[in-house]
Amino acid sequence: CDAQSLGEDDMILMDLKYKDRVGEIHRTRYNPDHRWVYFPQMTPDEVILLKCYDTERDGRARWTAHTAFDDPTSPPNASPRQSIETRTIAFYDD
């Protein structure tokens, strides 16, 4: 989702329950003003990098709402999507 179309009120903080602990996660509230982007023709050598969270509140994007869905136009024998998720913390001087 285009971060410029995502308001603070669109993000809902919820508990993320594990067997041994409880964490937190943001869920996205529906808003007809959201501008979603879809990349149906990606090749195996292409990637998308998402900024999932930033503590700064200076006008830069703080997060990117993202999702997956079953594409009804996919051929029945299409290979399933493969994803790699990494969580990286970057510290830098301004």
Regions found by a protein language model. Give the residues of each.
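Short, basic/aromatic beta-hairpin or loop at an interaction surface
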Residues: 16-28
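Catalytic core of Fe(II)/2-oxoglutarate
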Residues: 26-94
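Extended boundary segments
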Residues: 1-15
